[in-house]
Amino acid sequence: PVIEEFGVLLKIPEAAEFVNSLYKLGRAYNLWPIAISQEIGDMAGARGILNNTSTVFIGKVSPFEADQVADILGLKDSARALIKSLGGERGRYREYFVQVTKENAREGDVIQLWPSKMLYWLLTTDPVERSKLGDTLGAYRGNLTEALRSLAGERQGEVRV
């Protein structure tokens, strides 16, 4: 299961217990529950989840937030430096710090995500781009695939917004 903004659930005792049990059972049944948060503070209250997490992805954060994440996760200074170095180029790629724990050993490094143009348009959070996507979606009568193809430049001689 994917749990978006899991910090909200951690504030409800019964929900927090359920989320923690998903992570404990995940190991036993070879499941891979995913908890997503954009708030560093959510991680501080998620010790049970963190203790049963084998893979962590961290996107670009401020230097202060990088220190918070490193402290909460108990990362070495080398990992802290990698998190502070994260970058990317808008519309092309983003960098993420990924840490994998196997048999009580942790390894981490920086990866780059280079999305296709269609995936970029699907996932963009930029308000201007979201508005353009909405306009293009309207021009294609709600056909998301065709709207994305148009924005990605994969359609010739078609409606352009």
Model-assigned labels for residue ranges:
Residues L50, A66-A70, R80-K84, G134, ...:
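Generic detector of well-ordered alpha-helical segments enriched in charged/polar residues
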Residues L25-Y29, I58-S62, A81-L86, L122-V128, ...:
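Glycine-rich loops and low-complexity Gly/Arg-rich segments
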Residues P1-L82:
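Conserved P-loop NTPase motor cores
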Residues D67-G87, R92-A105:
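Electropositive, surface-exposed helix/loop patches at the edges of structured domains
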Residues E89-V161:
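Conserved P-loop NTPase motor module
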